[in-house]
From Swiss-Prot:
Keywords: Chloroplast, Hydrolase, Plastid, Transit peptide
Major location (coarse): plastid
The name this protein goes by in its record: Isoamylase SU1, chloroplastic
Any one Pfam family match given in the protein's UniProt record, by short name: ISOA1-3_C
Length: 789
């Protein structure tokens, strides 16, 4: 038996969870790569003739000369001209539209035009064959359609060529595929509803652009925040307003989200990290169990905003989604909030060889995907295929896409899902070295991690992308873990998974983590300082869309994912959670109080750590998913922001989180540009100046000099015992409590406007006068230095 290649899909595998599987019972068009080639699945409408290239021969007395006959389309209303090979995609020019698409292996190609009604009826309005002599330059097919009748129409391509999966080729003239450079994609009209006839994969087509841009940016400019000043909020756009309690006019849409942006401003958030908003198919896994691809980590087209997040759906050929996304960004900027997009360039929705032919696979499979010599798909993504990111054509495509979202859509940065895949060597299908230098006969093995990946180099040094935020999820499903070691050119930040794990361990009282926890508070210098990076290259988080919510982290010791339909096999088993003594939501009063303290402790840690804090949508009010740590497939309340719950608890956890983000912004010392020095930061134990870094230590405290507050004292007691701590003496000053998670709200955060604040502080005077402070078990405190008057 042949040896199985690492992370290569087996001869006929199913897609790996959690991405779902290509099930035998999935409904949709039979344009599946694993099936044999079929007859044309779309037919041209009889009302309009197909324009064909005709070569006319004229006899002359001296010689024979071939003359290309002038061609027309759409009943003679449009002229068909040679066109230009650049730029790729559909480009509105004076008098018409230029179409250009890369395909290195196709022997024939045609442009398919759709009227919206014909697309819905699953038929091509008109097909324009491309002449390989006139309409091809190198590996780019191109054509210019002159005339106004294209406005409001849609387009796709047919490609013919070799269909040989064992050689990595899937050319099949029976499929109309979507242009990777399409700026909007139109398919089904309503979110979560199959097309007429029950199809979950109806024919898709790209929007033909208009020659003018009607969107009013109202003078919008980049906010240009320094990354050290960010407070990031990971948000799912549909989930943010889909719950009935949002009371928005257009729930689950870009416009609906705009109506709730003031909540984020009030919360102190100045950066949104949007979960995937590229065009994807939420019915990708649809079956009798009605599972959805809710999160959207399975892209169909990287240039197109998700059409079914638009309040207008597909009624305007996709223009509505573009303009509503722009409106969302513009209105966020007006409120001082940047927008970062979560982009999934590690794989696509086409899956493995049993997946559908939608776009990349039918255009040039061996260019766009990592393939083994016998055509198998490498599976470093865990989702059936791996995007061939460092191939010259693919990396050019990715950079073009990022530039578009920055220049046209005004986004402020990107978070790259499974970014370690972007560092792996590409498939080499020719004897030519695609890395541009002689290799003396040795080829880089497909998937090898590269020290200087060409794609990362291009992005890092691109003049247009130079000032945007770049965040890497520095690992992949193939076991490559690069946190602290991602190739960075001093511009890439990382989701700091080590911060998450260390903070979870220490806050729940695990021995042996005091020193590592202190490292996290300093911005993880052991990870980032030696490589020349700064604390703000660490994106600090405790919870994200993957895994438990903050409330579930302190409520469940085990995951409860049965509702996902995978027998609880999916999702992370290593959660480092602690239920505080009783499993589940319904617990005793003492356990519930402890859970409240723990949630606050985590949030205090996030806000006092050097680096960039990020928290997940709903954690500010204690959203629960019932212990499900992998809710990728649920389009209901478990993934919806509960505005009613936020209001119910506005005086409790939400108030605390809002005040903590405000406190962080007020303290210059909590967002330093460089790692704190010993002159500014001092460590303490139960007694000042005597930190305990022993294996059994569950107490960490520090003081930090601050330009606005003078000095702050922060302590974490994660022992099961209360403790009275000694405070550093400061002549002429006294310590005053601001935060104490051991106290019930509103005394957990003492504000100047609290009616009985003075009385509360006075109650501690007998301790404070002696430079002491009592701490409950599993609690954290913040004190500030005040003049002793």
């Amino acid at each position: 038996m042949a040896q199985q290649l690492p992370c290569v899909s087996s001869p006929r595998p199913l897609l790996a969870v959690p991405a779902g599987r290509w099930r035998a019972g999935v409904r949709g068009r039979p344009n599946v790569a694993g099936l044999g080639r079929g007859r044309l699945s779309l037919h041209a409408a009889a009302a309009r003739p197909v324009a064909e290239a005709v070569q006319a021969e004229e006899d002359d007395d001296d010689d024979d000369e071939e003359v290309a006959e002038e061609r027309f389309a759409l009943g003679g209303a449009c002229r068909v001209l040679a066109g230009m090979p650049a730029p790729l995609g559909a480009t509105a020019l004076r008098g018409g539209v230029n179409f250009a698409v890369y395909s290195s292996g196709a022997s024939a190609a045609s442009l398919c035009l759709f009227a919206p009604g014909d697309l819905k009826a699953d038929r091509v309005t008109e097909e324009v064959p491309l002449d390989p002599l006139l309409n091809r330059t190198g590996n780019v097919w191109h054509v210019f359609i002159h005339g106004d009748q294209l406005h409001g129409m849609l387009y796709g391509y047919r490609f013919d060529g070799v269909f040989a999966p064992e050689r990595g080729q899937y050319y099949d003239v029976s499929n109309v595929v979507v242009d990777p450079y399409a700026k909007a994609v139109v398919s089904r009209g309503e979110y979560g509803v199959p097309a007429p006839g029950g199809s979950c994969w109806p024919q898709m087509a790209g929007m033909i652009p208009l020659p003018y841009n009607k969107f009013d940016w109202q003078g919008d400019l980049p906010l240009g925040y320094h990354q050290k000043d960010l407070v990031i909020y990971e948000m799912h756009l549909r989930g943010f307003t889909k719950h009935n309690s949002s009371k928005t006019k257009h729930p689950g849409t870009y416009i609906g989200a705009v109506s709730k942006l003031d909540h984020l401003k009030e919360l102190g958030v100045n950066c949104i990290e949007l979960m995937p908003c590229h065009e994807f198919n939420e019915l990708e896994y649809f079956s009798s169990s009605s599972k959805m691809n809710f999160w959207g980590y399975s892209t169909i087209n990287f240039f197109s905003p998700m059409a079914r997040y638009s309040s207008s759906g597909i009624r305007d050929s996709g223009c509505g989604a573009i303009n509503e996304f722009k409106a969302f960004v513009r209105e966020a900027h007006k409120r001082g909030i940047e927008v970062i997009m979560d982009v999934v360039f590690n794989h696509t929705a086409e899956g493995n060889e049993k997946g559908p032919i939608l776009s990349f696979r039918g255009i040039d499979n061996s260019t766009y995907y990592m393939l083994a010599p016998k055509g198998e798909f490498y599976n470093y993504s865990g989702c059936g295929n791996t995007f061939n990111c460092n191939h010259p054509v693919v990396r050019e495509f990715i950079v073009d896409c990022l530039r578009y979202w920055v220049t046209e859509m005004h986004v402020d940065g990107f978070r790259f899902d499974l970014a370690s895949i972007l560092t792996r060597g590409c498939s080499l299908w020719d004897p030519v070295n695609v890395y541009g230098s002689p290799m003396e006969g040795d080829m880089i093995t497909t998937g090898t991690p590269l020290v200087a990946p060409p794609l990362i180099d291009m992005i890092s040094n691109d003049p247009i992308l130079g000032n945007v935020k770049l965040i890497a999820e520095a690992w992949d499903a193939g076991g490559l873990y690069q946190v602290g070691q991602f190739p960075h050119w001093n511009v890439w930040s990382e989701w700091n998974g080590k911060y998450r794990d260390t903070v979870r361990q220490f806050i729940k009282g695990t021995d042996g983590f005091a020193g590592a926890f202190a490292e996290c508070l300093c911005g993880s210098p052991q990870l980032y300082q030696a490589g020349g990076r700064k604390p703000w290259h660490s994106i600090n988080f405790v919870c994200a869309h993957d895994g438990f919510t903050l409330a579930d982290l302190v409520t469940y010791n085990s995951k409860y994912n049965l509702s996902n339909g995978e027998d609880n096999r999916d999702g992370e088993n290593h959660n480092l959670s602690w239920n505080c003594g009783e499993e589940g939501e319904f617990a005793s009063l003492s356990v519930r109080r402890l859970r409240k303290r723990q949630m606050r402790n985590f949030f205090v840690c996030l806000m006092v750590s050097q680096g960039v804090p990020m928290f997940y949508m709903g954690d500010e009010y204690g959203h629960t998913k019932g212990g499900n740590n992998n809710t990728y497939c649920h389009d209901h309340y478990v993934n919806y922001f509960r505005w009613d719950k936020k209001e119910e608890q506005s005086s409790d956890l939400y108030r605390f989180c809002r005040l903590m983000t405000k406190f962080r912004k007020e303290c210059e010392s909590l967002g330093l540009e460089d790692f704190p020095t010993s002159e500014r930061l001092k460590w303490h134990g139960h007694q000042p100046g005597k930190p305990d870094w022993s294996e059994a230590s569950r107490f960490v405290a520090f003081t930090m000099k601050d330009e606005t507050k003078g000095e702050i004292y922060v302590a974490f007691n994660t022992s099961h015992l209360p403790v009275v701590v000694g405070l550093p003496e400061r002549s002429g000053f006294r310590w005053e409590p601001v935060v104490d998670t051991g106290k019930e709200a509103p005394y957990d955060f003492l504000t100047d406007g609290l009616p009985d604040r003075a009385v509360t502080v006075y109650q501690f005077s007998h301790f404070l006068n002696s430079n002491l402070y009592p701490m409950l078990s599993y609690s954290s405190i913040i004190l500030v230095l005040r003049p002793d008057v």
